[in-house]
Amino acid sequence: MSTSIHATTIFAVQHNGHAAMAGDGQVTLGEQVIMKQTARKVRRLYNDKVLAGFAGSVADAFTLFEKFETKLQQFSGNLERAAVELAQEWRGDKQLRQLEAMLIVMDETSILVVSGTGEVIVPDDNLIAIGSGGNYALSAGRALKRNATHLSASEMAYESLKVASDICVFTNDRIIVENL
């Protein structure tokens, strides 16, 4: 049995001038054991002006949160600059390259995915998801954004994660939504 500890499924959306990020609460040990059902995978950073969520190794994610928050401070809350600088450091540092996690970071105007291979990705349609249930959440989110425009960003984030939790065994329905 694998002893790696993973946490999965984050979804972020900007809709009608509002931004929301949702994460489920499940932390899995290896492939078979649920260690925790109420983890908080979405955090507020930089005076509550930035949201960050992680999928992947829990310990690695905490390292990345800390490094990203340092970059935000260094670049006065400039989300894009902080994300690019983190990605460059992550890609260029031999020890950091070993980290197994991805981040979604967002403020009121931007959503970015930051990966350990140095990518900083801006989604085309103002929504993105990562983690084992990410594809399910992304599909649900796109359908909601196209066909349920009356929903708030927060409702879209919650419902997208709910769909993922119904399909993905590594995603539960203990959903936490943060809004900007």
UniProtKB/Swiss-Prot annotation:
Localisation per UniProt entry: Cytoplasm
Reported function: Protease subunit of a proteasome-like degradation complex believed to be a general protein degrading machinery.
Residue positions of the active site: T8
Protein family membership: Belongs to the peptidase T1B family. HslV subfamily.
Organism of origin: Staphylococcus saprophyticus subsp. saprophyticus (strain ATCC 15305 / DSM 20229 / NCIMB 8711 / NCTC 7292 / S-41)
Gene3D superfamilies recorded: Glutamine Phosphoribosylpyrophosphate, subunit 1, domain 1 (3.60.20.10)
Residue stretches spanning the membrane: none
GO cellular component: HslUV protease complex; proteasome core complex
EC class name: hydrolase
Catalytic activity: ATP-dependent cleavage of peptide bonds with broad specificity
Keyword annotations from UniProtKB, A to Z: Allosteric enzyme, Cytoplasm, Hydrolase, Metal-binding, Protease, Sodium, Threonine protease
E.C. number: 3.4.25.2
CDD domains listed in its UniProt record: protease_HslV
Entry protein name: ATP-dependent protease subunit HslV
Xref: SUPFAM superfamilies: N-terminal nucleophile aminohydrolases (Ntn hydrolases)
Matches recorded under HAMAP family: HslV
Example of a GO MF term: threonine-type endopeptidase activity
GO biological process: proteolysis involved in protein catabolic process
Broad class of where this protein is predominantly found: cytoplasm
Activity regulation information from UniProt: Allosterically activated by HslU binding.
Keyword GTP-binding (UniProt): no
